[in-house]
Amino acid sequence: MSTEEEYIKLLDRLYSKLPERVQKVSGQSLPNLIILSIGNNTIIKNFSEYCDRIRREDKLCAKFILKELAAPGNVDENGQLVIQGKFSSASINKIMERFIKTYVQCSTCKSLDTVLIKEKKAWYISCLACGAKTPVKPL
């Protein structure tokens, strides 16, 4: 067997072990958060849709935002995040960017097509585009 045939055989073997590429999250673009200040509350109207788009649970995203803002809040039945206190949309958007960089974006290929996996006490980002598995700090 020639070296070229061996090379082709090894490449085929490699490709058979790689995960299949999955459709990307519509061009890596995310919708803008719709943030309203009503009375002494700040409401993120499209919170559930946003969390669905980045493939993360509402509770997990809410926990991160509320922890960063040091404020109480909850996700209501309409899928809106209601935060007690007035906060600027710029500060909430910065917190969401930090969440995406830490818990959503693949550190290898920068794709947003990832899932968060919890194995025992360790948390990992598993990329659906390149197959990388990156450990992250637990929430």
Curated annotation (Swiss-Prot):
InterPro entries: IF2/IF5 (IPR045196), TIF2_bsu_arc (IPR004458), Transl_init_fac_IF2/IF5_dom (IPR002735), Transl_init_fac_IF2/IF5_N (IPR016189), Transl_init_fac_IF2/IF5_Zn-bd (IPR016190). GO terms for molecular function: translation initiation factor activity. This is Translation initiation factor 2 subunit beta. eIF-2 functions in the early steps of protein synthesis by forming a ternary complex with GTP and initiator tRNA. Heterotrimer composed of an alpha, a beta and a gamma chain. Keywords: Initiation factor, Protein biosynthesis. The lineage of its organism: Archaea, Thermoproteota, Thermoprotei, Sulfolobales, Sulfolobaceae. Belongs to the eIF-2-beta/eIF-5 family. The gene is eif2b. It holds the Pfam family eIF-5_eIF-2B.
